[in-house]
Amino acid sequence: MPIDFLQPADIVAPQLLGCIFTHDGVSIRLTEVEAYLGAEDAAAHTHRGKTARNAAMFGPGGHMYIYISYGIHRAGNIACAPEGVGQGVLLRAGEVVAGEDIAYRRRGDVPFTRLAQGPGNLGQALNFQLSDNHAPINGTDFQLMEPSERPEWVSGPRVGITKNADAPLRFWIPGDPTVSVRRGRPKTRK
């Protein structure tokens, strides 16, 4: 059954693991994601309401929210939940499965497992641009292909944030070498 992006982000997030996500000549298999739950989640960009910067997260679900992180990295979320709710899933890490040569040109001389490891590196490998903001994930610029079989996954605390960090809203494929952060004990296993 296809992913329903009108569901809450914490329901959508683990369904994205193992999906092939393609943009600008590079395809990655998603191995790590984080859910952000809008107004109820102090770590979400949408916690304090809708702004020009975060408007893409307010829907419709299934569209990209691209933003600048730490003043230099372009990171991407997929908006989730009904329009107006402001939830999304941050794409944290993946394995390059097509377009490896293009990813290396964008990322430089890094180990293969680090080509799309971490949200900024993933954004660089896939060449996210601010002009991609609001783009549908299954349109002309982005494609998402679901796996024939869903991988096992675990969840645990999010990383790189201070607010609501202990919430088990980071989801990853256990043992995958492309996962960006290995600290944090899994709280759930599926």
Curated annotation (Swiss-Prot):
Pfam families: Pur_DNA_glyco. GO terms for molecular function: alkylbase DNA N-glycosylase activity; DNA binding. Keywords: DNA damage, DNA repair, Hydrolase. InterPro entries: Formyl_transferase-like_C_sf, MPG, MPG_sf. Transmembrane segments: none annotated. The keyword Hydrolase applies. Its EC number is 3.2.2.-. CDD domains: AAG. GO terms for biological process: base-excision repair. It comes from the Bacteria. HAMAP family: 3MGH. Belongs to the DNA glycosylase MPG family. This is Putative 3-methyladenine DNA glycosylase. It comes from Corynebacterium efficiens (strain DSM 44549 / YS-314 / AJ 12310 / JCM 11189 / NBRC 100395).
